[in-house]
Amino acid sequence: MRRDTLVFTVAGILFGLVVGYMAASWDVVPRPAAVVSAPGARAGAPAGAPPSARLNPDEVKALEALAARQPGDAAVRVELGNLHMDAERWDAAVRWYREALAVNPGLVDTITDLGACLVSAGRPQEALPEFERVLQADPGHRNALYNKGIALLQMGRAADAAAAWEELLKRHPDDPQIQGLRGRIEQIRATAGK
């Protein structure tokens, strides 16, 4: 197997893990009462619909109107970013996360989500400084360390990705959600040794 094929295979698997990991660990910002929907439901989207079909345009419009009325409200901008991220509309999510961070630059989870969207949009070079920014504030931030590894892997820096994940495992040794990284790190090390 060629090295670049292996790297892309590992990157694809890890991307799937990142999306699943992030979806399981996000802290959702409460929605304004006017746009609350049933848990897990998005109006107008059938079950099993592709992510882009799950974006409720009425919910987005209501939140955008609220954001326009409340320019100092970072939470509504984070929620808009989350909705677009869930729908895999990376550029829109990036826009709203950046707006939230303009209001409150200290939201480390939002910075991490911004970086994750940039990685998903194929812009890992832009994402890496975002993860570094989070890690300056919180060196053990689980999602930032994990996603930093994904960004580095996409940039062809597999050894650096493995180092980021080793740091993650060192800081969170008992976290069952990240134990699968040990095998990925071993694969990277084995490939680098050839």
Predicted regions and their residues:
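Canonical tetratricopeptide repeat
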Residues: 79, 113, 147, 181-184
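Structural marker of alpha-solenoid helical repeat scaffolds
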Residues: 69-70, 103, 137, 171-174
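Long, contiguous interaction/recruitment modules in multidomain scaffold/adaptor proteins
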Residues: 1-65
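Register position in tetratricopeptide repeats
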Residues: 86, 120-121, 154, 184-191
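Canonical positions in the second alpha-helix
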Residues: 65-66, 99-100, 133-134, 167-171
